[in-house]
Amino acid sequence: MSLSRLSARRAVLTGFGLTAGATLLAGCSTSAPERDDLVARAVAARADLFRQVPATRDLAASSAGYLIFPSVTQGAFIFGAQYGNGVLFEGGKPAGFYNITGGSWGLQLGAQNFSQAYFFTTPEALATFRSTRGLELGAGVDFAVANVGASGAISTSTLQKPVIVFVYGQQGLFAGVNVAGQKITERTDR
């Protein structure tokens, strides 16, 4: 077998392994202390976002709810996968626990960790999110990835969307973050 065929085979197997691992992790249950730790990390990630983008404090106060993923891990070598756990806040208090997963393929390489926040700006957007068996961005969901200006202000056109997504705190080497194709599902281990 030639070296290029071995490399291609390794890339395919690595991609499948990443995707399978993310899928298996999505089904893991969590104990009460682990949930408490997740809430603490989500509160800290929310504070980081408020510090980095001060306008998000008002956005959180005016939104029907918001979902914070304090740590989303993404890795890829041709095939990619990402996974994280998050907390839904309503009225500033934890109201549910969620997983985020994603898979992709193409010319990509790297690994990174980042935080992600989803603001549901209308009661209808939050109700739709809560009533579905999983939100998949890019599948008919009207959302905007926030464009934040140098002043920390959020663009007016972004504020008019029912779901606003922020990606922040990136660490690692990876060529960009793609939120389309991510799937968010409620955890059943509350």
Q: What spans do the regions from the language model cover?
A:
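Small-residue-enriched, tightly packed secondary-structure blocks
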Residues: 29-190
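N-terminal secretory signal peptides
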Residues: 1-26
